[in-house]
Structures are given as structure tokens and as C-alpha cells.
């Protein structure tokens, strides 16, 4: 009576191993799902950044105001007879 129980327990363990720890097991599926969620969050962040950059490029292509603003703030350039006063923000 003892041998069939031992054989059955070993058989259950042998059949459960691939399900939990095998190549397509639950642990691997859980890990891939976690990686997928992290990648989706990264993609969403990058899409928002790209949208902002696209808007900035459109603004730079369409008008001179954005170019003038960049020239003032980044390069410190001014128009003739213009005084530019820049007050830095507190960090």
C-alpha cells in the first residue's frame, strides 16, 4: 500500500515541475508580465515626451517667437535698443 502512494507523489511532483518552473511555467509568465507592464509605462512616458518635442518643433518651424525666446533665454541675445533682464528661479 505504501509503494503506490510514493509513486503517485513522485508522479505529481514530476508533472508539476514544468508547470511551475519550466520554460513556459507560471513563474516565467509572471516575470514576463511584470516586464511587459514596466515597458508599457516606459513607452507611455516616452510618448508624452515625444508629443512635447513635436509641439516644440512645430512651434519653431511656424513662427519666430519661439526662436526669439530661445535666443533670449539660452544665448542671452537681444534686439537692438532692447534691454533683457533675466531673473533666475529659485531651485
Swiss-Prot record:
GO terms for biological process: FtsZ-dependent cytokinesis. GO terms for cellular component: cell division site; cell septum; plasma membrane. Residues 28-74 form a coiled coil. It is a single-pass type II membrane protein. The chain crosses the membrane at residues 4-21. InterPro entries: Cell_div_FtsB, FtsL/DivIC. It is found in: Cell inner membrane. Its main location: membrane. Keywords: Cell cycle, Cell division, Cell inner membrane, Cell membrane, Coiled coil, Membrane, Transmembrane, Transmembrane helix. Pfam families: DivIC. The keyword Transmembrane helix applies. Part of a complex composed of FtsB, FtsL and FtsQ. Essential cell division protein. May link together the upstream cell division proteins, which are predominantly cytoplasmic, with the downstream cell division proteins, which are predominantly periplasmic. This is Cell division protein FtsB. The gene is ftsB.
